């Protein structure tokens, strides 16, 4: 059994694997990152370290999250590929107040290949409708990953 944090984008439900979550915070203020796509909400500082923050609703639909009491900044462990370094990445999520415990095998392929949204994972159907698993490691296109997490300069 896996534990998931549920959230919504519009009327649709999505899930994040709780094992990929470092912290769930209230909605945080961010500093703009010039040159970043509009769905990059900005930069925040947590425990003295800068953390880039994505607006997941803006990434998926072009419309930013609505600041509500249920809107959260969720810090995840972002890693591109199995051998890549791990970074903290913030995600602005709406209605991030519920969890789901289920067998990960209950998520099945959705039948689509969203090349423009490779972070969209398998889906699960329950009494409330579909839930789609968000793949954290696939959230950032290569150019945005290079902007937010540049490779260290050689010594």
Language model: regions and residue ranges:
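An acidic, low-aromatic, low-complexity terminal/linker signal
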Residues: 1-155
């Amino acid at each position: 059994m896996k534990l998931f944090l549920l959230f919504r984008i519009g009327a649709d439900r999505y899930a994040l694997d709780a094992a990929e979550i470092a912290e769930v915070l209230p909605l945080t203020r961010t500093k703009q990152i010039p040159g970043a796509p509009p769905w990059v909400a900005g930069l925040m500082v947590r425990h003295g370290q800068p953390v880039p923050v994505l607006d997941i609703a803006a990434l998926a639909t072009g419309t930013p999250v609505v600041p509500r009491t249920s809107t959260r900044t969720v810090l995840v462990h972002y890693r591109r590929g199995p051998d890549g370094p791990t970074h903290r990445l913030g995600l602005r999520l709406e209605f991030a107040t519920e969890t789901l415990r289920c067998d990960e095998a209950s998520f099945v392929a959705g039948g689509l290949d969203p090349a423009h949204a490779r972070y969209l994972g398998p889906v699960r159907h329950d009494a409330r409708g579909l839930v789609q698993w968000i793949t954290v490691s696939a959230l950032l296109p290569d150019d945005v990953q290079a902007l937010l997490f540049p490779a260290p300069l050689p010594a």
